[in-house]
């Protein structure tokens, strides 16, 4: 409740100042429509001031959180709260669009690491996989061990450097001979393993995102392309 109240405060009171924006627009128009061909410097200053004015004070505040330990995780969680209330007003909806664009810069795919997750990964990371599997529930530690340690099973995830144990999105892959008849055949843990190098087919049978606050910041297609390359 407290965080939602804080988000409403940011949306209502810390957006772009319309009076200041109007002044900046008028200053830019005066320079742009001026007849002085030597006024390029003034026009550039007006453009710079206009861009600065268009950046809401709340965005500057959120940027400060990014500097803190686990700051990006905190902000992703904060946006998940905003998503649940953004329908309440136009100002909250506008705030959400700004927030999403901000997160998209911090979670740009160029900053993310593709990792193959193995059974030797930290327990916290394995627990996150189990808790966020959205397609085929992990039924036991034996189940997750099979998915990670079997010679014909792989798991790949996109990891942000500041969130090493919180994969943003992950995918399970089964290496097989031919296409499996059904998904249950892939999920059974007592199947004979396909020896490394003998598989002729890779089946991507599940992909799950873990951060609701990054909704709209797409990683899925990038992850698939990277795993195909691997």
Segments (PLM) and residue ranges:
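Extended, composition-driven regions rather than compact fold-specific motifs
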Residues: 1-230
